[in-house]
């Protein structure tokens, strides 16, 4: 892409509020920085409240009963039972950032409808029917404190919850004796109001502890990339908020699976002002990319063998000992019409540089050539050093960072070693450049197109994204959607 100038559970959206947030510490710079704007918080709030609404709508209202006494009529009893919430409407949920480390979700003007049955007894008289309870002006305010545990996982607790109900109205139907109930409707309304009031915050707290927090725990901070590497997205410090963004700083470090050694490079300092027009903003440092290269280099997987039919029938060059006759006649004479095998590897890690002009690097490879004897054993011929300049174009697909490597010029060759005497490397320039561009580069880009996972919670994907290259880091700004 071009550089721009400018159904899992819905709780997964609230997870987004926590995944992208930690505080910068003086001791450790992050390899990956992420922020969520107010627009992103609003998106997450809307989706999270949908799930909360389901929980609130499932409120279990217990049966209750009482007695009444009316002058000249004496005592009687009443009972309300089989009550169920018929609707819990939440019109305009809001979310705001608390200073330092939390979020406040508040709901105003919500309403609840409850249907049920009633029964009344007075001496030998018995009556009953249906009722409808309308609860108006329900408000809920809850604080979520975000943090991290010792392993770098996200934690969240509901530190405070308050609720309020403005008014309750009951509508009785089904019997001529309903007027008895209406005489003391305020007492009944108050009793039902208190029951609902006590239930609301309990459900909110239970939802955070039984649904949101376990979901956070399922998000692995060590994300498997492939059979060779994983990436560490653990939090470096407690979660924090500013007045405009929920900010997060993660380790952002690739490593060879099963091997975790100290690295010879360090993350750069990333400073940028996010665009609040997008939901999320991610700063991806050159450290992130370069630890990926280091992991593959340390594992010994940055190599490719070209031989056999791949070389002899490539369509343009038949790379065998007969081909070497021009500059290595001794080889052609000693090993007539035998196959040649090439081993292309990266003896030293490639360092990727990110600048405002884009992502670039200067790969240095090594090619070892062998004669393949009839018994499949190898005879070493020579070693070539190879260097060129290249660029990396990045893109995002769903929840992954993908890329494409492009060569900026022809490979320059240098003879580093020869078992059969020196020769001019110019004889091999065309064939090496052709083989790398047609066989090696497509394999690299095939891996880059598979991509690398970004720290997004389950059920969340990118949309409307753009990239900005800065000095030492790449900025990704995007909106999000649910799948």
UniProtKB/Swiss-Prot annotation:
Disulfide bonds join 161-201. Pfam families: LBP_BPI_CETP, LBP_BPI_CETP_C. Belongs to the BPI/LBP/Plunc superfamily. BPI/LBP family. The 199 N-terminal fragment fused to gas vesicle protein C (gvpC1) of H.salinarum, when incorporated in gas vesicles (GV), increases the survival rate of mice challenged with lethal concentrations of lipopolysaccharide (LPS) and D-galactosamine, if GVs are administered before challenge. Expressed in testis, epididymis, and bone marrow, as well as in Sertoli and promyelocytic cell lines. Upon stimulation with different TLR ligands, it is strongly expressed in granulocytes and in bone marrow-derived dendritic cells. Induction: By lipopolysaccharide (LPS) through TRL4-TRIF-dependent pathway. Expression in Sertoli and promyelocytic cells is enhanced several-fold by all-trans retinoic acid. Residues 1-27 form the signal peptide. Glycans are attached at residues 375, 389. This is Bactericidal permeability-increasing protein. GO terms for cellular component: cytoplasm; extracellular space; membrane.
């Amino acid at each position: 892409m071009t550089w721009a100038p400018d159904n899992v559970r819905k709780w997964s959206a609230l997870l987004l509020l926590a995944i992208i947030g930690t505080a910068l510490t003086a001791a450790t710079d992050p390899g990956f920085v992420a922020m969520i704007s107010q627009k992103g918080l609003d998106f997450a709030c809307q989706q999270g409240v949908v799930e909360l609404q389901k929980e609130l709508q499932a409120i279990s209202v217990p049966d209750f009963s009482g007695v009444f006494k009316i002058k000249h009529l004496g005592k009687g009893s009443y009972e309300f039972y089989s009550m169920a919430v018929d609707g819990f409407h939440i019109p305009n949920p809001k979310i705001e950032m608390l200073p330092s480390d939390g979020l406040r979700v508040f709901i105003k003007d919500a309403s609840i409808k409850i249907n049920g049955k009633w029964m009344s007894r007075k001496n030998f008289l018995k009556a009953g029917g249906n009722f409808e309870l309308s609860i108006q002006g329900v408000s809920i305010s809850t604080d979520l404190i975000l943090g991290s545990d010792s392993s770098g996982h996200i934690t969240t607790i509901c530190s405070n919850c308050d609720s309020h109900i403005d008014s309750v109205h009951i509508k009785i139907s089904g019997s001529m004796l309903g007027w008895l109930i209406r005489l003391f409707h305020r007492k009944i309304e108050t009793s039902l109001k208190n029951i609902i009031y006590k239930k609301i915050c309990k459900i909110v707290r239970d939802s955070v502890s039984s649904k949101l927090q376990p979901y956070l725990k399922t998000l692995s901070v060590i994300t498997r990339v492939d059979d060779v590497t994983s990436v560490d997205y653990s939090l470096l410090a407690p979660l924090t908020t500013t007045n405009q963004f929920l900010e997060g700083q993660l380790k952002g470090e690739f490593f060879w699976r099963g091997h975790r050694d100290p690295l010879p490079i360090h993350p750069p300092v990333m400073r940028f002002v996010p665009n609040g027009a997008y939901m999320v903003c991610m700063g991806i440092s050159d450290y992130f990319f370069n630890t990926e290269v280091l992991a593959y280099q340390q594992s010994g997987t940055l190599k490719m063998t070209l031989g056999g039919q791949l070389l002899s029938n490539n369509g343009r060059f038949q790379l065998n000992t007969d081909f070497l006759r021009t500059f290595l006649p001794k080889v052609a004479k000693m090993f007539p019409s035998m196959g040649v095998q090439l081993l292309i590897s990266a003896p030293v890690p490639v360092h990727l540089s990110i600048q405002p002009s884009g992502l670039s690097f200067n790969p240095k490879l090594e090619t070892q050539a062998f004669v393949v004897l009839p018994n499949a054993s190898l005879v070493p011929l020579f070693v070539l050093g190879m260097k060129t300049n290249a660029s990396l174009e990045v893109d995002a697909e769903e929840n992954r960072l993908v890329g494409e490597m492009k060569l900026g010029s022809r490979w320059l060759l240098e003879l580093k070693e020869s078992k059969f005497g020196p020769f001019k490397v110019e004889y091999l320039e065309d064939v090496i450049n052709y083989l790398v561009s047609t066989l090696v580069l497509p394999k690299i880009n095939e891996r880059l197109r598979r991509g690398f996972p970004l720290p997004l919670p389950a059920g969340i994907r990118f949309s409307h994204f753009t990239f900005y290259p800065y000095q030492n880091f790449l900025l990704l700004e995007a909106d999000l959607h649910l799948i």
